[in-house]
């Protein structure tokens, strides 16, 4: 059986507890193949967020286009 494919669009959490990292773990638990497009990169841990750096819109668009031009995405999840 080929797993369904989901795309998450959101921020990257350096601590691994939120953002696309958490989304990809959830997709895996649901036996869904996860793809991602990163909107921002954070410097954070369990104590808080220290910094957020947004990616340029063109970079985000390129990530989304790359995934959608190749894979049959069945679901989309968005974050920050």
Describe each region flagged by the PLM.
Residues 1-75:
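Small-residue (G/A/S/T)-rich helix-start motifs and N-terminal tracts that mark the onset
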């Amino acid at each position: 059986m080929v797993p369904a494919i989901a795309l998450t669009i959101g921020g990257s959490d350096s601590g691994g507890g939120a953002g696309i990292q958490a989304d990809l773990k959830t997709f895996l638990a649901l036996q869904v193949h996860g793809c991602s497009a990163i909107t921002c990169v954070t410097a954070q841990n369990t104590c808080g967020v220290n910094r957020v750096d947004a990616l340029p819109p063109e970079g985000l668009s390129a990530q989304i286009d790359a995934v959608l031009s190749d894979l049959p995405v069945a679901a989309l999840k968005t974050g920050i």
